[in-house]
Amino acid sequence: HETLANIHGQSQGSGGSPYNVLLDLAKMGADFPLQGAGLVGKDALGQYILDDCRRNGIDPKFIAVNEDALTSYTDVMTEKEGGRRTFFHCRGANATWDGSDLDFSASDCRIFHLGYLLLLDAIDAEDPEYGTRGAALLAAAQDAGLKTSLDVVSEDSDRFARIVGPALKHVDYCILNEIEASKVTGIAVRDGDK
């Protein structure tokens, strides 16, 4: 804190819930279509993601390029002693993607995985019919016959019920840790043996 901290190593990779799920399925040899959806910037990181998808057998046809925004990225700093991590995140192009360009009828996929609510500003925006744009997108996927799954980001805020709540009606599989579940439901997490 306000002193020099040395960096002892660096690596680059793609990540995030949807990408990690796709990559894991590709590496397991999934015998069904894998397609990415979202938005990257017209920059080296965006090109890296598109190339990495293709290299791993993930069809990037639903990943658009925004010429006016940076590709979203996270710098993760891990303490050498103890392994505690701090995440510095640039929302970039992800903040502007609302999924309106996604045509589920043009996809051969069977499941739509949305991640991360609370980190995608346009997806988290209000929708007059569904509550949020994310809920509308999940409903559209279900209407097209896809199963849906959802992952959220852990944050210290009061937005969970407002943003995640409406989406739950349109989710087949929801991935929450105990802290996220507590914030969505309003039920306090038990503290140890109490």
Predicted segments — roles?
Residues 1-55:
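Glycine-rich phosphate/adenosyl-contacting loop at the front of the ribokinase-like
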Residues 39-41, 50-65, 69, 76-194:
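Ribokinase/PfkB-type carbohydrate-kinase core domain
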Residues 4-7, 72, 104:
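Hydrophobic alpha-helical segments and their boundary regions
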